[in-house]
Amino acid sequence: MKPILLQGHERSITQIKYNREGDLLFTVAKDPIVNVWYSVNGERLGTYMGHTGAVWCVDADWDTKHVLTGSADNSCRLWDCETGKQLALLKTNSAVRTCGFDFGGNIIMFSTDKQMGYQCFVSFFDLRDPSQIDSNEPYMRIPCNDSKITSAVWGPLGECIIAGHEGGELNQYSAKSGEVLVNVKEHSRQINDIQLSRDMTMFVTASKDNTAKLFDSTTLEHQKTFRTERPVNSAALSPNYDHVVLGGGQEAMDVTTTSTRIGKFEARFFHLAFEEEFGRVKGHFGPINSVAFHPDGKSYSSGGEDGYVRIHYFDPQYFEFEFEA
């Protein structure tokens, strides 16, 4: 399995994301550049220039017309995917940590950090109403008083958002009223990443408490746990197999003091039902910050602290592999 190496960032990768068809891969890092690549051969299509700080999150809408990015320069920006033109600039008081389009691509949500005396908020904008963008006034803003949101995704049918917090809590917020619909606490430490399954019936969380967990996306009922010895930075579900891939490694500040073998910088594959690890993929020099499955399930990508993104196309053995219970 020879990976395709994407060199487009000079700082560590913060998030990678495929569009719905999987022909494009968007990558953002702790530099101001937003890159988009052809996933089939790793050719760089272009960049979205405009941010002036680290970019924490990226999302593309259903038909890949628009791209949304959130950055530590206290802004969330909307781009035309094809031309790279900036369509909207939403200023915030603190860094934008998570962002996402709903299904129609009409409503965006993003969450801001609790820093410099400012509260953590989730803001909802309707892109069909230009006055909201021009006046920078969201139609709804949910304050998070307890611990700040570290990862968030739209729930099924765009009726709610599922948010993971610094303290390990999971909340489901209504996108209509803003109230908390469900609240659970299954993790003991910060939730770094949330990714939904292809059919949106379940999602996987990656946490600093060395585990990734599987939840039902409507009830937030805890289903499975995948245990490792290191903080998990990202986890993704395969669209056509019962497989989950975990990416992690130790804290960035501890990285230089250990050798790579001790650091455990592999991507780890677990079986969804049996919670058993069945494979590892080496490659990154440093922790893996973000993993994503291609929507066809034939490849996956990982972005690391080393600033590289690797696209791995699975060998034929992967598709013939039968898990022995």
From Swiss-Prot:
Q: Does the keyword Ubl conjugation apply?
A: yes
The record's InterPro entries line, in alphabetical order, gives: eIF3i, WD40/YVTN_repeat-like_dom_sf, WD40_repeat_CS, WD40_repeat_dom_sf, WD40_rpt
Gene3D superfamilies for the chain: YVTN repeat-like/Quinoprotein amine dehydrogenase (2.130.10.10)
Q: What are the N6-acetyllysine sites (modified residues) in this protein? A: 264
Instruction: Find the cross-link Glycyl lysine isopeptide (Lys-Gly) (interchain with G-Cter in ubiquitin).
Output: 282
| Record's subcellular location | Cytoplasm
* WD repeat intervals: 8-47, 50-91, 144-183, 186-225, 283-324
Modification Phosphothreonine, positions: 219
Tell me the Gene Ontology biological-process terms attached to this UniProt entry.
Answer: cytoplasmic translational initiation; formation of cytoplasmic translation initiation complex; translational initiation
Q: Which UniProt keywords apply?
A: Acetylation, Cytoplasm, Initiation factor, Isopeptide bond, Phosphoprotein, Protein biosynthesis, Repeat, Ubl conjugation, WD repeat
Tell me a Gene Ontology molecular-function term this record carries. Answer: RNA binding
Query: How is the protein modified post-translationally, according to the record?
Result: Phosphorylated by TGF-beta type II receptor.
Modification type Phosphotyrosine: residues: 308
**A single Gene Ontology CC term:** eukaryotic 43S preinitiation complex
Instruction: Report the function annotation for this chain.
Output: Component of the eukaryotic translation initiation factor 3 (eIF-3) complex, which is required for several steps in the initiation of protein synthesis. The eIF-3 complex associates with the 40S ribosome and facilitates the recruitment of eIF-1, eIF-1A, eIF-2:GTP:methionyl-tRNAi and eIF-5 to form the 43S pre-initiation complex (43S PIC). The eIF-3 complex stimulates mRNA recruitment to the 43S PIC and scanning of the mRNA for AUG recognition.
Q: Could you describe the subunit structure of this protein?
A: Component of the eukaryotic translation initiation factor 3 (eIF-3) complex, which is composed of 13 subunits: EIF3A, EIF3B, EIF3C, EIF3D, EIF3E, EIF3F, EIF3G, EIF3H, EIF3I, EIF3J, EIF3K, EIF3L and EIF3M. The eIF-3 complex appears to include 3 stable modules: module A is composed of EIF3A, EIF3B, EIF3G and EIF3I; module B is composed of EIF3F, EIF3H, and EIF3M; and module C is composed of EIF3C, EIF3D, EIF3E, EIF3K and EIF3L. EIF3C of module C binds EIF3B of module A and EIF3H of module B, thereby linking the three modules. EIF3J is a labile subunit that binds to the eIF-3 complex via EIF3B.
Can you name this protein? Answer: Eukaryotic translation initiation factor 3 subunit I
Q: Which organism is it from?
A: Bos taurus (Bovine)
Read off the lineage from the record: Eukaryota, Metazoa, Chordata, Craniata, Vertebrata
